[in-house]
């Protein structure tokens, strides 16, 4: 569908998710560039549907002239890549939606992977009768120490209002509204449904439960657990196994590559 503008928003240390001295650490940022190219970018280039663009969101205070940021600009990909500051996001989208019926924003981190049908799946949900739609997943994989042989099922807690998701998306029907302040970052992980209902109430539209969708597809995404990812800092007080079950993934190398891209050295 050529009337869809789809941005995948990737937080490249764009907000204060850890101590500021770590947030601006050059070694951390250099590693982040390599991790992005190995994981998130590989899985996005592996998508069946490539009708989307990537936005790498960087912190408002990061110097754009430092090597890690310059390296992001040097990345060669068949997917269009934008590098912008977090506070520039709304204006950027407003400047680029003319002529489109739907704006889709999806979120993932630079160190995670999504299955090859994720973009295709969310774009199939565009419906002219639905003003604002949410889609997330609740059955993921955790990969420990960058080793595909060391992967486990991950079932984030779903409380009926939201779930910890790697690939969350919202569809904004631009025929109903052009309030671009609403994107995937407008909804929280755990309180997304009440926020969506509030939007419907504020705009005098009828909300239906099917407008908030949790997809139960098995093995939808891979949460890459390693020492440099933001949650290793953000959740340092939690048990190291909080993000996985005891159910090991028993799949061959080719299955991982076909589903998530060739991230395996």
Show where each model-derived region lies:
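A short, charged/proline- and glycine-enriched loop
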Residues: 1-7, 101
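Conserved catalytic core of nucleotide-sugar-dependent glycosyltransferases
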Residues: 88-98, 106, 113-201
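Active-site-proximal specificity loops/subdomain of glycosyltransferases
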Residues: 17-33, 57-107
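Short, acidic, metal-binding catalytic loop of nucleotide-sugar glycosyltransferases
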Residues: 24-30, 38-51
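Short loop/turn segments at strand-loop or loop-helix junctions that form parts
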Residues: 7-20, 59, 136-137, 224-227
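Short loop->beta transition adjacent to catalytic acidic/histidine clusters or analogous donor-positioning motifs
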Residues: 5-6, 45-56, 77-80
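C-terminal catalytic/acceptor-binding lobe
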Residues: 4, 169-265
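Domain-scale activation on soluble regions of proteins
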Residues: 11, 32-35, 117, 121, ...
């Amino acid at each position: 569908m050529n009337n869809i503008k789809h941005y995948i928003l990737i937080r490249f240390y764009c907000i204060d998710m850890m101590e500021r001295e770590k947030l601006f650490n050059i070694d951390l940022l250099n590693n982040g560039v390599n991790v992005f190219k190995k994981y998130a970018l590989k899985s996005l280039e592996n998508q069946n549907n490539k009708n989307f663009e990537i936005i790498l969101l960087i912190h408002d205070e990061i110097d754009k002239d430092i090597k890690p940021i310059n390296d992001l600009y040097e990345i060669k990909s068949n997917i269009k890549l934008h590098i912008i500051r977090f506070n520039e996001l709304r204006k950027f989208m407003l400047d680029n939606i003319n002529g489109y019926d739907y704006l889709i924003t999806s979120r993932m981190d630079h160190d995670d992977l999504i299955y090859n049908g994720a973009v295709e799946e969310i774009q199939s949900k565009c419906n002219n009768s639905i003003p604002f739609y949410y889609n997330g997943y609740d059955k993921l994989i955790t990969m420990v120490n960058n080793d595909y042989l060391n992967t486990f099922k991950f079932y984030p807690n779903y409380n009926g209002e939201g779930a910890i998701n790697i690939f969350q998306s919202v569809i904004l029907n631009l025929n109903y509204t052009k309030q671009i302040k609403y994107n995937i970052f407008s909804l929280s992980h755990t309180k997304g449904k009440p926020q969506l209902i509030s939007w419907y109430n504020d705009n005098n539209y009828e909300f239906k439960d099917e407008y908030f969708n949790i997809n139960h597809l098995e093995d939808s995404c891979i949460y890459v657990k390693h020492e440099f990812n933001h949650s290793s800092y953000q959740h340092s007080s939690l048990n190291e196994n909080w993000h996985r079950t005891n159910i090991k993934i028993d799949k061959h190398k080719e299955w991982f590559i076909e589903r998530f891209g060739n991230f395996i050295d």
